[in-house]
Amino acid sequence: PPKPKTPKKKEPKVEAKVPDAAKDSLKTKSVKPPEKKKEQEINPAIKALAKVIFSLKNVSFNWNETNGLLLPGFNRQSEWLGQNWDGSSAPGFAFTFGSQNQDIRERAAKNGWLTTDSTFNSQFTSTYTQNITGRATLEPFTGFNIDVNFNRNYSLSTTENYRAFNSPRANGRYYETLARVETGNFSISNLMWGTSFTKDRKDYSSTIFERFAENRRILSERLGNENPNSSGVGIDGYRDGYSGTSQEVVILSFLSAYSKKSASRMSLDLFPSIPLPNWTVRYDGLTKIAFVKNLFQSVNLNHGYRSTYNVNSFTTDVSYVPGGNARDINMDFIPKRQIGQVSLSEQFSPLIGIDITWKNRNNKSSGSKSATERGGRSSGGNFTTRFEYKRDRNISLTLAGIQVTEVKGREFTFGAGYRIPNFKFPFGLFKSVNSRRSNDLNTTLDFSVRKNTTILRKLVEGTNQPTAGLTIISIKLASDYTVSERLNLRFFFEKTINTPVVSTSYPNANTAVGITIRFTLSQ
């Protein structure tokens, strides 16, 4: 039989009481973890630079140069590879393969490759063009795009009559230049933002033009310091050789005033080397805001800026002497290049522009069907609106008489468009032509008001006179409809009202109404 289980005896519990003082001594002290070293703060300038670098989406840069030489009077026969193989090796492989070394003139004359006819009058010509363009696209945050661009264009054409000789002249040369002339033009992207919103006074006088006149003394002083041939200050307060009507003084003062550059620190080069940036800005992220998203399908904000400095043409002054010591009748130093006119242009295109595509609000009732359910196609936003405000300036400085012509323009444009999807003409019109499909009818309406003003400012006389100007009101209405793949209809109405600013002109209005039918014979 199984043995009965004996119950286990309970062991007595022993409790040891610890005095309170001992408890305090037994408490473990909490050890704080070592503090982390604070991260070294990054310089804000470095942060900003890094942000710009990482926002770059696309960068392009182009530097193009074109050179050319034309040397008439060559009296050898060119054969294969462009050489003359009678022992002279004229004109040489370097020339035929594109060398632009102008020493070819002396070498050709010395080797007897050029005609020595005294009646020969064709000109040696060399050409040079340089085009520099750059472009970068940045996206600092989603939906915000900035296109930055710059450019610099320079062209130079050199022509000279010459004589070639069979024996060296007194200077040991076989080639003699008779008349050398350089002509060219120049343009570079610029910034005029600092004076864009400066208003004229009621009498058409301008603080910018006054600054232009004042800056002449500062720049005359700087130019005089650069030229060791200039000595002292004249009774008119200008440096010797650089009066208030000197070409260099006037052009540099013009640039400093209208581009708002410091006359004390700006470059003295009439042909700057570094182009300044222009830009275009677009933002389409407003629809991320809830109440905007409920109303509009898309909202685009636009802004564009462009400015250019132009030297329309320049030519060599035949009276110029290297070293800058030759003077004209006004006792000013004669510059190497004679410039007739320079200009500054600026366009805000637009200063601000808004393009909106509205959401359709039709068929909200529960019982109505959408266009897609009715067998049509989803049309998206049918109604579009846009607003643009543009500003532009074209300021030209004519050195003859030293006068500035300012042409300013401002334009407001309001536009609207509406698209009727699946439009069908009444009375079954075009039904046989377009029986298989229905197209959209697109209608646009543009209303614009533009004001142009031309002001002539004369530096010596100190006058400011409006010479031309118009207020132009324009209304344009147009509807387009594609009847078929080959037939397109367009109705248009245009009204333009011109109101002159000066009393010597008369107001006029023009109206144009019509229908355009375009039929494509081949698809």
Q: Which residues does each predicted region cover?
A:
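Exposed, low-structure sequence patches enriched in small/polar residues
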Residues: 1-523
